[in-house]
Amino acid sequence: MENKNQKHNNEFHEKNQQSQKDNNNVKKENLHEDQSDLNDANFDDGGKKNKLKNDIKKLNHLVDSLKNENNNKQAKIESLERQINLLNENFKSEVIKKASEAQTKLDEKIKEFQAKYETELKHAKKYALKSSAIELIDIVSNFELAVNSKVTNPEIANYLKGFQMFANMFKNYFQQNGITEIPVNLNDDFNAEVMQAFETQKAPNTQPNKVIKIIKKGYKLHDIVLVPATVIVSE
């Protein structure tokens, strides 16, 4: 009887141990599955984070590229503005330089003429100024051509006003010393004694051999023609 009970107890104990083993195995399997699910979830989150990082990196790269492109365009604009300013400054400097050179030459001519005039005035007779006057008349004629030209630059216009002042000063000087303009008007008959024909042109409703345009004024010293008036004559 005791043997049977002992045997029965042993069997129950073995079954109980087996049941515990089975339960432990089930728990381990469930734990493994939970861990696997957790790893899968972590993998998905990590993939999203990496994709987000890559997207942010691409956006930053695009922003940097746009900034560089904008900086390059701004640099080109600034370079062009500097070139334009430099050209304007060079043009202005060139105009001032030419005007200064003309002023210097004019001052030299005035001094030369005054010195020569004062010397000749003492020793020459009535027409002693002829050669000097012709040279000066040519200068005055060039001044008048420059003054009568149309300009839009204010600085050049101011220099031309200065040229006009010098031309007027010389004309007064001429009058004081017997040098006068030869009177020539449009539609006057061409007079070879006081005029020279620059060219002839057809002029409708105008008789032949008439003055239709005055190119340069003529001058005489007392009764001698120094420089004939240059005109265009009708055919």
UniProtKB/Swiss-Prot annotation:
Q: Where is this region: Disordered?
A: 1-51
Please provide one cellular component term from the Gene Ontology annotations of this protein.
cytoplasm
Q: Where in the cell is it found?
A: Cytoplasm
| InterPro entries referenced in this protein's UniProt entry, alphabetically | GrpE, GrpE_coiled_coil, GrpE_head
Q: Where are the transmembrane segments?
A: none
Q: Principal localization?
A: cytoplasm
- Residue ranges that the Swiss-Prot or TrEMBL entry lists as coiled coil: none
Compositionally biased tracts (Basic and acidic residues): 1-16, 24-35
Question: Care to name a GO molecular-function term for this sequence?
Answer: unfolded protein binding
- Give the record's keywords alphabetically: Chaperone, Cytoplasm, Stress response
Checking PROSITE patterns in the record gives:
GRPE
Kindly give the Pfam families that the UniProt entry links to this protein: GrpE (PF01025)
Q: Which GO terms describe its biological process?
A: protein folding
Could you tell me what this protein does? Participates actively in the response to hyperosmotic and heat shock by preventing the aggregation of stress-denatured proteins, in association with DnaK and GrpE. It is the nucleotide exchange factor for DnaK and may function as a thermosensor. Unfolded proteins bind initially to DnaJ; upon interaction with the DnaJ-bound protein, DnaK hydrolyzes its bound ATP, resulting in the formation of a stable complex. GrpE releases ADP from DnaK; ATP binding to DnaK triggers the release of the substrate protein, thus completing the reaction cycle.
Question: Quaternary state and partners of this protein?
Answer: Homodimer.
Give the family from UniProt: Belongs to the GrpE family.
Q: What is this protein called?
A: Protein GrpE
